[in-house]
Amino acid sequence: MQNKRNQSRVLWLLLIYITIGIFIYVGVNSLIGTPDVSKIEYSELVQMLEDKKIVSLEIEDSGYARARDNRGLYYETYAPTLLSDQQYVYGLANQGIEIKYVRSLENSWWISILTFLLPVFLLIFLFTFLFRSSGGGANQGMNFIKSPAKKYDPKKTRTTFNDVAGVKEAKEELTDVVKFLKDPKVFNRLGARMPKGVLLVGEPGTGKTLLARAVAGEAGVPFFYISGSDFVELFVGVGAARVRDLFNQAKANAPAIIFIDEIDAVGRQRGSGLGGGHDEREQTLNSILVEMDGFDPSIGIIVMAATNRPDVLDKALLRPGRFDKKVVIDRPDAEGRKDILKIHFRGKKIAPDVDLEVLARATPGFVGADLENLVNEAALLAARNGEKFITMKDCEEAIERVIVGPERKTRVLSEQEKEVVAYHELGHAILGTILPNADPVHKVTIIPRGYAALGYTLQLPSEDRYLMNKSEILDDIAVMLAGRAAEEIIFDEITSGAENDLKRATEMARRMVESFGMSEKIGPVAWASESEETFLARELFREKNYSDETAKELDSEVKQIINKSYEKAKSVLLENKEKLQFIAQYLLKKETISGQELRDLLQKDTDDLKEYVENLGVSSTQEEAKVVNYEYLSRENNLIERKGI
């Protein structure tokens, strides 16, 4: 195969060199030996002939004439009369003027043929290059319209439900699909109709692709994998052709599973995009719909698709007879995370102190991909440190690296900046500890990590929860604003470090007013749009469902919630100002303190706390606070990461 490619490459290079050589030859042949020529009128040439100044004359069949005078200068003019008036030319020859007839370059037959064939050769070369680039080899140009789907043989790379954890309900939903693929006749005999399509809906990293492969592995049938973006190419009609080819391959290997990942790339609502109603994406979608209607369900083909944006899919995809079975894959709970960790720790050497239950509780909101990354980071850290086993310390550091990134040891802060960061983070931490509805604090640090965090506070919900009441949300907003409040109280100045806190607090307050109906003035009315995600094609043409007057009231309510929460944060910090100052000195000495340490310090009275901090004398060998628990920014699936600066 490699020799054929090399031979083809040599032939094309040879063709290119020959073409370039012809152009060079023509150009040089037309230029070499041709002196400077002056353009003159025909009447001037006639006058010079009468004055006997011309010694030679070249007449081209194109009508142009080139003359040389007795001084060796050349002249050129358009003189078609010299071609038709032969007696006049004979008379010039009798006067001793050298007459020569030449064929013009433009009328040369081989130049004409070259001019015609060269563009054809170039077009053939261009299209052949494109087809071969897409097809992957010589004589495979038609592969350009063939489906690029990858076929997985369950006998070679088998994935089963034992390799999938944390999605118990989803596996139960897909058990019928497995049974149907194993023996379709059982369902056909009873008159049951299995769904033609199964849509897996879940956030990125929840294991949609892995679950689809597990279904194929359990059933022992071929698995065709393709991404939605693979259908759309430069040339119109390629996507539809690839859809037809994909279904033909599946029918030839039935029973089989067709899995289309990120189907929203081609399955978005038609007529709502910026490309008009007849773009390539819509043709591809139409082809998918036709194919799903056309194949016989009794032959044992199941079309599975995955998306994290079900709100933008075309309704025709979701109607009965197409993707009429929807399986939601949610983030795993603590028990599910423990099972996922067991799978990823298989075959790895772990120390006896590694407690999977503790790690599962320490990672709320983590999806399967996050947990896989966590285990890999822990293994890399153990290898980097020359350890024989993965320890609990490696796992704890890995969690922190996944959430906020590695330590930035090269980022050296000035003493003044360190002090600002310490007070900012303690503002978050003290509010999180004192307010009754806030999530418990588990770590406060002023060690820079990741891209932008100069310090951070980690909180962890005591349990997996799926609802938040109004008091919890208001306390969360107060905690977010407490970093800025602490800066204002201590330094009578504010910094840019609260930018992220302000964004998150404002967003949460707006959701309270517009989505949750938690504003007493506005009442239980939902003003937010249907989708929290931005979809450009919709947003351009969507009209607000409320007036400008209502918009002012909504903004006013959001601002009022923020202001009240900020005043609440300042009030709590002012009541504990002295403790804030002493604990800040403690944090500056230790750089990292645990949530339990912080709670113990806040329980001391002011005098005892002052004496304790002054007599601390932290040495470089003193053991730092051991942190086990980490968290996400809210129960809205964001990291609970108080990035101070």
From Swiss-Prot:
This protein's cofactor list reads: Zn(2+)
Relate the assembly described in the record.
Homohexamer.
UniProt cross-references to CDD domains, sorted A to Z: RecA-like_FtsH
Q: Which NCBIfam families match?
A: FtsH_fam
Cell location: Cell inner membrane
| SUPFAM superfamilies found in the cross-reference section | FtsH protease domain-like, P-loop containing nucleoside triphosphate hydrolases
Which residues participate directly in catalysis? E425
Q: What gene does this protein come from?
A: ftsH3
Q: Name one GO biological process term.
A: protein catabolic process
- Could you list this entry's UniProt keywords, alphabetically sorted: ATP-binding, Cell inner membrane, Cell membrane, Hydrolase, Membrane, Metal-binding, Metalloprotease, Nucleotide-binding, Protease, Transmembrane, Transmembrane helix, Zinc
Report membrane topology. Multi-pass membrane protein
Q: What highest taxon heads this organism's lineage? A: Bacteria
| Residues that coordinate or bind Zn(2+) | H424, H428, D501
Q: Which terms does the record give in the GO molecular function aspect? A: ATP binding; ATP hydrolysis activity; ATP-dependent peptidase activity; metalloendopeptidase activity; zinc ion binding
* An annotated GO cellular component: plasma membrane
Q: What is this protein called?
A: ATP-dependent zinc metalloprotease FtsH 3
Q: How is the cofactor bound?
A: Binds 1 zinc ion per subunit.
Is Zinc set as a keyword in this record? yes
Q: Do you know which Gene3D superfamilies this protein is assigned to?
A: 1.10.8.60, 3.30.720.210, P-loop containing nucleotide triphosphate hydrolases (3.40.50.300), Peptidase M41 (1.20.58.760)
UniProt source species:
Petrotoga mobilis (strain DSM 10674 / SJ95)
Q: Where does ATP bind?
A: G202, E203, P204, G205, T206, G207, K208, T209
Q: What class of enzyme is it?
A: hydrolase
The Swiss-Prot or TrEMBL record describes its family as follows: In the central section; belongs to the AAA ATPase family. In the C-terminal section; belongs to the peptidase M41 family.
Q: What function does this protein fulfil?
A: Acts as a processive, ATP-dependent zinc metallopeptidase for both cytoplasmic and membrane proteins. Plays a role in the quality control of integral membrane proteins.
Periplasmic topological segments: 33-110
**Annotated HAMAP family:** FtsH
